UniProtKB/Swiss-Prot annotation:
The lineage of its organism: Bacteria, Pseudomonadati, Pseudomonadota, Betaproteobacteria, Burkholderiales. Keywords: Cytoplasm, Pentose shunt, Schiff base, Transferase. This is Transaldolase. The active site is at K126. It comes from the Bacteria. GO terms for molecular function: transaldolase activity.
Amino acid sequence: MTTALDQLKQYTTVVADTGDFQQLAQYQPQDATTNPSLILKAVQKDAYKPILEKTVRDHRNESTDFIIDRLLIAFGTEILKLIPGRVSTEVDARLSFDTPRSIDKGRELIKLYEAAGIGRERILIKLASTWEGIRAAEVLQKEGIKCNMTLLFSLVQAAACAEAGAQLISPFVGRIYDWYKKQAGAEWNEEKDGGANDPGVQSVRRIYTYYKTFGYNTEVMGASFRTTSQITELAGCDLLTISPDLLQKLQDSNDTVTRKLSPDALQDKPAARVAIDEAAFRFQLNDDAMATEKLAEGIRVFAADAVKLEKLIDSLR
């Protein structure tokens, strides 16, 4: 019998969301994504400590920032040995409001990959979907450096990313779901408010429809899933990046997966494009409490994990 994972792959490019690259082979994803939290989690496992220790040993006299960049490339390089497609490597979240330094970091990471013999067509540079991050992506894209816009929670962010020519966006399904569920409290009803009505699922569906309606080439990759239901409700989305735990659940399931999103069957098409000059962007983002709070929280969490990784590296010198 065909597994739910195999059925999903008929409609959507499946991406593995992990730094634990030893798990990749069993799920055969096309691409992989990493972030500071996933790398921090991976290097604390016995299987990956040798990569961390070797990177620190080889560059002991260099700055911690220098070592972290090499560690990211070491993980990305190993991941690319196991997948046919692309890996996403994230720019330090502490640069989320600094366009020039985000551009410099993106260029630097690509140079390191190319020095390791990996072409830029296999790399996506992850940037936070702040106004400053989007402007950095606009510059990098024109240089042939493809960008994955992360921490995306709203249509205005998605619209701005598309106008900037970003290669790909990662709307965060699960974190949107978390916010609305917390706000609802005891009134939340999973049967009524989940599934196709899940606010995270609806957000991605709205963004997907917007992009296809207006002919944007930016890829939509749903991310940050809590349940397999959220994933299967988005079957047909350009890409979905999924944690190993949920990939395993899909592989263990024989439930029928049907296509839910298609450029040929768009529903509730928008009438007009979103206004996305800087003032309009900032106002619309500010007007969306969920997106504002989750973007700020996401940057804080990734920045905190970057600091933890720095401390771990410094302890090994």
